[in-house]
Regions:
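Flexible "arm" and connector segments at domain edges
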Residues: 1-64, 68-101
Length: 101
């Protein structure tokens, strides 16, 4: 399955819940999705608080999936081709030099 197929499935779910409706109590705006993305990313950190390895990889997988879904949705509603953006960023990073510590 590719990024577009995942995005389509995510959009189907959001539509089926009515979250794209104008009167939705969960308006799917770029701002709200960015906030949700950050909150879900913070939940990933909880799995590593005071430990080097996640204590429950199944729960961690769910949090990673939440982050990915919000990222796909944010890219979708802002008209960003996430696959292209990722490939472009990889090319930029190939040429980038990071400080060696």
């Amino acid at each position: 399955m590719d990024i577009q197929e995942l995005t389509d499935r995510m959009n189907d779910l959001v539509r089926s819940k009515g979250w794209y409706d104008e009167d939705s109590k969960r308006p799917q705006t770029p701002r709200n999705l960015a906030i949700s993305l950050a909150l879900e990313a913070a939940e990933i950190l909880e799995h590593f608080q005071f430990r080097e390895k996640a204590k429950d990889t199944e729960q961690l997988a769910g949090e990673l999936a939440d982050v990915a879904l919000y990222l796909l949705q944010l890219a979708s509603i802002t008209g960003i081709d996430l696959e292209k953006a990722i490939l472009d960023k990889i090319e930029v990073n190939k040429k980038r030099e990071w400080d060696q510590e």
